[in-house]
Amino acid sequence: MILSTQAAGVVSPLGAVTPLSLTGRVSMLFRSAASALGSVFPFGRPGRGLIAGARDDTTTALPRGTQGIRKVAILGIHGWYPRKALRTVIGEPTGTSQKFCDEMDLALKEYLDQHQKILDPQDIVKIPLEGEGKVLERVELLYQNLVRNHAWRRAVQEADLVLVATHSQGTPTSILLMARLIEEGILRVREDDPAMQRIGILTMAGISHGPFPFLKGMFIVRWFEAEAARELFEFMDSESHIARKYRDGLRTVLSSGVRMTCVASLEDQVVPLYSAVMTSIHHPSIVRAVYIDGTSYQNDFLINLIAFSLRLRNMGVDDHGILVHLSEVMAGALYGEGHSTIYDEREVYMLSIRSLLEPPASLTSERSRSEPILNPFRAKQRLNPFYLPWGMRGIADEIMARGDQILIKELERVKRLYNDWNPVSKAMKEIKFRLEPVRSKL
């Protein structure tokens, strides 16, 4: 089932639930969720997922869509290559670059078919880039692999549409690689260039702000894994050398008009929600979403609060740190599959295509090429539990000050869900207890 909006908030596979279709075959539960969280885009493919989130309802999508698309280059870039001991946690990287290319290719063809546009097979070139190591080592290796392959380089240079799909450690690797391609003129991003390319990057469970801090001292990481794994924790501090390099790359990419879709996995056992959605980075060309495993989906207060917070970020409204403070409690079991199952969901790829080809009218050229705001960030082992109600109060005050009736109604709905919420686990009960003082503000 897929419920989608211009800027997405929630992605969840729903197992045997009948997918949404033009005939309206969907449970009332999800009709309600769709109505509350945004517009509905039906898809014909029986899927595992639901995408619900936000759009700026005062705007409409720009009409360009598939116009001018004659050639496409799809780059797939896998994440960190773990040793055997951790592959059940991280997932198998070998072949995932090809999988990302294949899934993006299928999603694109489905999208083009919906818009009565057909490209010849040779006009879509898939470029699976593979190579291990630390981030900067990988950037150099993948760059050389790309430019030395004349067919791949030509495909990238001649493409009207460039799509990138990446996962985990592949996120900073991809951003730095794309920044280099932009700086060297291999990618054409100048507005005065009649052959300017449209470029979209899909990051899945990206490790932009590092893994969960509590993983740093784990025996399995310290003993079995080497420099590439330890480097991931350097992203927890925005002042580290590699984090500064990454932010320079983000600045280049986002100010060049590249559209980014950042999808987290709700029960990720490695990458926290705030890290995957780049919570400290602010730019109108970033669309944020979260993937929820079907067995974990509940239409309750917490899920809707996360979706609501993502909706705010997608509309350019501050979430007042809520996503950071909800991330730890949503961590998946260490040997679960939340970190790797995200890239099996086709609609995650479809979301990134829609985000690129159907931007809101409010995303003007000037805004899409503005400098990103890169707030300092440092992950903490322990968070102040009393910050959560202040964050919620901040959201409520900002929404009321804006006077946005759509958001005010959303806030009222969140309050009703809070009142009806009867959490079972200790962690969820603690969240409800912490938010009790701010109930009246909601």
Model-derived features: positions:
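Active-site catalytic motif of lipid deacylating hydrolases and related acyltransferases
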Residues: G9-P46, R64-V162, M204-E231
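Alpha-helical repeat scaffolds in large eukaryotic proteins
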Residues: K109, Q144-A151, A179-I182, I353, ...
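Extended, polar/charged low-complexity intrinsically disordered and coiled-coil segments in eukaryotic
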Residues: M1-A61, L232-E234, H241-S255, R259, ...
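Conserved beta-strand scaffold positions in the cores of enzyme catalytic domains, especially
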Residues: V72-G76, P121-L129, I201, M260-C262, ...
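Alpha-helical interaction elements in eukaryotic regulators
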Residues: T96-F100, M104, V135-R138, L142, ...
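Short, conserved catalytic or adaptor-binding loops enriched in Gly and charged residues
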Residues: Q114-D120, D192-P194, V253
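Intrinsically disordered, low-complexity acidic Ser/Thr-rich regulatory segments
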Residues: D57-P63, D192-A195
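Serine-dependent carboxylesterase/thioesterase catalytic core
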Residues: L136-D248, L254, V270, V277
